[in-house]
UniProtKB/Swiss-Prot annotation:
The lineage of its organism: Viruses, Varidnaviria, Bamfordvirae, Nucleocytoviricota, Pokkesviricetes. It is found in: Host nucleus, Host nucleolus. This is Protein OPG061. Disulfide bonds: none annotated. The gene is OPG061. It comes from Monkeypox virus. Keywords: Early protein, Host nucleus. Its main location: host cell. InterPro entries: Poxvirus_F16. Induction: Expressed in the early phase of the viral replicative cycle.
Length: 231
């Protein structure tokens, strides 16, 4: 199956694009899909954007079997409307996958169905590594901050994943702190809440320190392009 990956960001300060690509590539590899093209969009996808040459090349190519999005929210119109717009210029049906949402839009007639959330397997390994790093006294904030950006794209993206897997994350945190399974049931809920809140608060600190660095990098890039040059 030949597919096209579509990633998108809402602002220049959104650093999640690389994480989106990694997640989509991992999903494609898991399902034995062949990635033939990757599209980076700014803003949401609508019917107007389908008129651009980049999209026309994809839509009119019947060798493309599917489009892999990171999530449904990348599309500002209904998925059904987007599908109908694409099919006006195709003779062969096309499927759509949404990695983060674990959804696929396909079939005859096309409809949503759940898919294997293999992205969680990738995220879990990275989150386990992150927790280990945060418990190591030899790891400073710079190392941990770079690990978050390299593997998740941004602190916001990481927090979104963590908030979707609260139970699993807290169990890993408790185990990494050396807490065994003999904890009294009456104390378990309080330990879970405390551990999770402490972990999230630590991550939010990396968000504030990283924002300044990202802004500096953005300004540097804009200077190189001449955007900030005085006329």
């Amino acid at each position: 199956m030949k597919v096209v990956i579509v990633t998108s960001v809402a602002s220049l300060l959104d650093a999640s694009i690389q994480f989106q690509k990694t997640a989509c590539r991992h999903h494609c590899n898991y399902l034995s899909m062949q990635v033939v093209k990757e599209i980076e969009e700014f803003g949401t996808i609508n019917e107007k954007k389908l008129e651009f040459d980049t999209w026309k090349d994809v839509i009119q190519n019947d060798e493309i079997d599917a489009i892999v999005f990171y999530r449904v929210k990348q599309i500002s119109i209904s998925t059904g409307v987007l599908y109908e717009s694409m099919m006006r210029n195709r003779t062969k049906p096309i499927s759509m996958y949404f990695v983060r949402d674990c959804l696929a839009f396909d079939g005859n007639p096309p409809s949503f169905r759940m898919t294997s959330c293999n992205i969680n397997a990738y995220n879990r390994n990275k989150i386990k590594d992150l927790i280990i790093l945060m418990n190591m006294k030899t790891c400073n904030k710079k190392i941990i901050g770079e690990f978050i950006i390299d593997n998740f794209g941004s602190v916001d993206a990481l927090l979104s994943i963590i908030n979707s897997n609260v139970t699993w994350v807290t169990s890993v945190i408790n185990n990494s702190n050396g807490r065994g399974i003999n904890i009294r049931v009456s104390n378990n809920k309080m330990l879970t809440i405390t551990s999770f809140r402490r972990f999230v608060n630590k991550l939010k600190m990396y968000k504030t320190t990283k924002c300044a660095s990202q802004l500096d990098n953005l300004c540097t890039k804009m200077n190189k392009m001449g955007i900030l040059d005085k006329k």
